[in-house]
């Protein structure tokens, strides 16, 4: 085969430093748009972006020559710098979670990310994160999972 045709969908989640509410609600739509532009500039296909004041979800397709860790580093570093330029003392927590998404689940994962505000009226980030790890079969140590 002379060409590559990857379509690996990845749902990534990362939290703010110490899961503090560092992303003001009024700036969130601008941050999501900014992240979309950063992704586009690095040939990352960002399909969905959303979150709350203390964490972010992104659904993306990576270029075939980019490791996931590099994509996350690009998104986290650029968004941290941009939030700092907005006058916010900001940092992301170290690390991230990443989950593969089947094409058949694309619309439900997109809806899940779009509805973060409503979702978090019923469940906090810690509960959500643990549930995502369990649902995906990711082994974790409860003492260390959230830093």
Task: Give the predicted meaning of each segment.
Residues 1-147:
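Basic nucleic-acid-binding interfaces
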């Amino acid at each position: 085969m002379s060409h590559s045709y990857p379509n690996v969908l990845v749902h990534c989640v990362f939290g703010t430093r110490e899961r503090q509410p560092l992303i003001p609600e009024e700036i969130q739509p601008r941050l999501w748009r900014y992240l979309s532009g950063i992704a586009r500039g690095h040939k990352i296909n960002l399909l969905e972006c959303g979150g709350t004041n203390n964490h972010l979800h992104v659904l993306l397709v990576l270029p075939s020559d980019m490791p996931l860790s590099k994509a996350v580093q690009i998104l986290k570093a650029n968004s941290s710098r941009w939030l700092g330029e907005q006058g916010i003392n900001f940092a992301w927590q170290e690390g991230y979670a990443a989950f593969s998404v089947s094409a058949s689940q694309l619309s439900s994962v997109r809806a899940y990310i779009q509805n973060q505000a409503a979702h978090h009226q019923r469940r906090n980030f810690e509960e959500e994160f643990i549930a995502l790890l369990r649902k995906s079969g990711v082994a974790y140590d409860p003492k260390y999972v959230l830093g």
